């Protein structure tokens, strides 16, 4: 391939369907590699075509074998239904292909004792033969159906004439004749039918596995949904745990030390905290479940909570403040939050407490279920919206990439057209068909792009001009005064055949 001239190289490429450009020292190796690759592809296509032509002949042979296998039982069935005696049990004819001496020597003595018509008993019939004949089933019928084809392929014309003149004899069971001498023939003939029967089985198996997969996926989604509901509803025993913690809290008894007073103070404090906890939990639950009382917040003002406790327990403000002081000094979670004006700051004294809020709102089952369902649906919608946004962004990026590729391809096509126009103009100038050896850039643009497409192709044209200015050495950009105005033109530079030193 290295010895090919430029003309031969161009002809080889054109014969393989590739239109090369100008062949120079810089592009000759590229075109040689291109020719080598095109020859390899042509060789692969020829091999594929030969394989495609050989495949129909194999399919026709398989169909012919299947047709012969279907016709064989029709020819063998009348002989099998004959009411006469079994021919293969009697002495075979002298001209028969089965009359070979000693062929069935091991079964001929026993066969003579049970030869007879179909209406007679067969006392001498071997029990082993009866068991084998009963086990064979449909496989024996298939083997009998191919007997005429084997007989017609026997040696000699006399065997074929005997077969055509005599009734079709019943063949010996395959269990007595030994293993099948052609085990591959049955598998070959049964291959297309078995494959045809296996296709629906594969489809049903695939459908069954898909249904199981969908079932398990549905069960998994159901379990995930129930888990989200359980987490959002929260543990119902949380308020009871808070009440148990309050009942176990110690009581401040600094002023009085007698046992009776301490017991009374403890009971009064626990009762006050219990009522305060229930009140705050109910108010917070009402605010979360529709807010029927039009509350501004779940955090209840201190004065409102103090009035409620005074009405229910008849406790003084001093006991209420003592309860708040104990909550601030306790390290246990009693389910009550004390908040100040700035709810982000931690309250340390009773004077800074502005409102009280329950840590465990008391809501009904329906409210908890609806809130959990709303939260789950919201999260699912947010997930799908994010997924749709990402999918749309991916589609937009793919569209952008495709447009950039199309624009780049259009730019390369425009570069080829510009090179052809400038080169043709130079050739015409050499033949005295043009006045100047250069051509204006705008003139080339107007000749290549129609007016209705110039705005759309402006970006492609600008990229093509930049590409020629930076990557094409055969075209030089010059400035000439044409009709009294400076104009950018392109001049084709013909490669010189001699260097300056040789001149």
From Swiss-Prot:
The keyword Transmembrane helix applies. Ubiquitously expressed, including bone marrow, brain, kidney, colon, skeletal muscle, thymus, testis and uterus. Phosphorylated; strongly phosphorylated in mitosis compared to G1/S. Keywords: Acetylation, Cataract, Cytoplasm, Cytoskeleton, Disease variant, Membrane, Nucleus, Phosphoprotein, Transmembrane, Transmembrane helix. SMART domains: LEM (SM00540). Residues 2-42 form the LEM domain. The LEM domain is required for inner nuclear membrane (INM) localization and contains a BANF1 conserved binding motif which allows localization to chromatin. In late anaphase, as the reforming nuclear envelope (NE) surrounds the chromatin disk, both the LEM domain and the disordered regions are necessary for localization to the NE core. InterPro entries: INM_ESCRT-Associated (IPR052277), LEM/LEM-like_dom_sf (IPR011015), LEM_dom (IPR003887), Man1/Src1-like_C (IPR018996), MAN1_winged_helix_dom (IPR041885). The modification N-acetylalanine is found at residue 2. This is LEM domain-containing protein 2. Residues 42-97, 127-157, 172-198 are annotated as: Disordered. Residues 42-74 have a biased composition (Basic and acidic residues). It is a multi-pass membrane protein. GO terms for biological process: heart formation; negative regulation of MAPK cascade; negative regulation of phosphatidylinositol 3-kinase/protein kinase B signal transduction; neurogenesis; nuclear envelope organization; nuclear membrane organization; protein localization to chromatin; skeletal muscle cell differentiation. The modification Phosphoserine is found at residues 166, 175, 497, 499, 501. Residues 74-130 are annotated as: Required for nuclear retention and interaction with LMNA isoform C. PANTHER family: INNER NUCLEAR MEMBRANE PROTEIN MAN1 LEM DOMAIN CONTAINING PROTEIN, LEM DOMAIN-CONTAINING PROTEIN 2. Interacts (via N-terminus) with LMNA isoform C (via C-terminus) (in vitro). Interacts (via LEM domain) with BANF1. Interacts (via C-terminus) with CHMP7. Interacts (via N-terminus) with tubulin; the interaction causes microtubule bundling and stabilization (in vitro). The lineage of its organism: Eukaryota, Metazoa, Chordata, Craniata, Vertebrata. One of its GO terms (cellular component) is nuclear envelope.
């Amino acid at each position: 391939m290295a010895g090919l001239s430029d003309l031969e190289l161009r002809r080889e490429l054109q014969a393989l369907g590739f239109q090369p450009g100008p062949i120079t020292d810089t592009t000759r190796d590229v075109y040689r590699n291109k020719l080598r690759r095109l020859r390899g592809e042509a060789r692969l296509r020829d091999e594929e075509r030969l394989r495609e032509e050989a495949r129909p002949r194999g399919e026709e042979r398989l169909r012919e074998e299947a047709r012969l296998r279907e016709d064989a039982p029709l020819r063998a069935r009348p002989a099998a239904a004959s009411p006469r005696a079994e021919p293969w049990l009697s002495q075979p004819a002298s001209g028969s292909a089965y009359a070979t001496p000693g062929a069935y020597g091991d079964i001929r003595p026993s066969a003579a004792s049970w030869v007879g018509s179909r209406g007679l008993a067969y006392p001498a019939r071997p029990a082993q033969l009866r068991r084998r004949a009963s086990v064979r089933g449909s496989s024996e019928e298939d083997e009998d159906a191919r007997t005429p084809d084997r007989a017609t392929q026997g040696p000699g014309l006399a065997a074929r004439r005997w077969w055509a003149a005599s009734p079709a004899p019943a063949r010996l069971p395959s269990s007595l004749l030994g293993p099948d001498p052609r085990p591959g023939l049955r598998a070959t003939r049964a291959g297309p039918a078995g494959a045809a029967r296996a296709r629906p089985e594969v489809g049903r198996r695939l459908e069954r596995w898909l249904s199981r997969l969908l079932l398990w996926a549905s069960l998994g989604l159901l379990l995930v949904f129930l888990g989200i509901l359980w987490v959002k509803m929260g543990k119902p025993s949380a308020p009871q745990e808070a009440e148990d913690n309050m009942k176990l809290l110690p009581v401040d008894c600094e002023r009085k030390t007698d046992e009776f007073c301490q017991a009374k103070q403890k009971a009064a404090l626990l009762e006050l905290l219990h009522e305060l906890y229930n009140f705050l939990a109910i108010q917070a639950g009402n605010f979360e479940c529709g807010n029927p009382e039009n509350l501004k917040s779940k955090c209840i003002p201190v004065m409102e909570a103090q009035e409620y406790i005074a009405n229910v327990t008849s406790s003084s403000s001093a006991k209420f403040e003592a309860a708040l002081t104990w909550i601030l000094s306790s390290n246990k979670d009693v389910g009550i939050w004390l908040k100040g004006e700035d709810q982000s700051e931690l309250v340390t004294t009773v004077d800074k407490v502005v409102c009280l809020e329950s840590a465990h709102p008391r809501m009904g089952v329906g409210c908890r279920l609806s809130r959990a369902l709303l939260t789950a649906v919201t999260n699912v919608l947010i997930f799908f919206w994010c997924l749709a946004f990402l999918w749309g962004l991916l589609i937009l990026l793919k569209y952008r990439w495709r447009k950039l590729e199309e624009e780049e391809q259009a730019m390369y096509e425009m570069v080829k057209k510009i090179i052809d126009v400038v080169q043709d103009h130079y050739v015409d100038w050499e033949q005295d068909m043009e006045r100047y050896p250069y051509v204006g850039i705008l003139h080339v643009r107007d000749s290549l792009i129609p007016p209705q497409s110039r705005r759309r192709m402006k970006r492609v044209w600008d990229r093509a001009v930049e590409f020629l200015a930076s990557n094409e050495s055969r075209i030089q950009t010059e400035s000439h005064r044409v009709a009294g105005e400076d104009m950018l033109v392109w001049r084709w530079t013909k490669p010189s055949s001699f260097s300056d030193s040789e001149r």
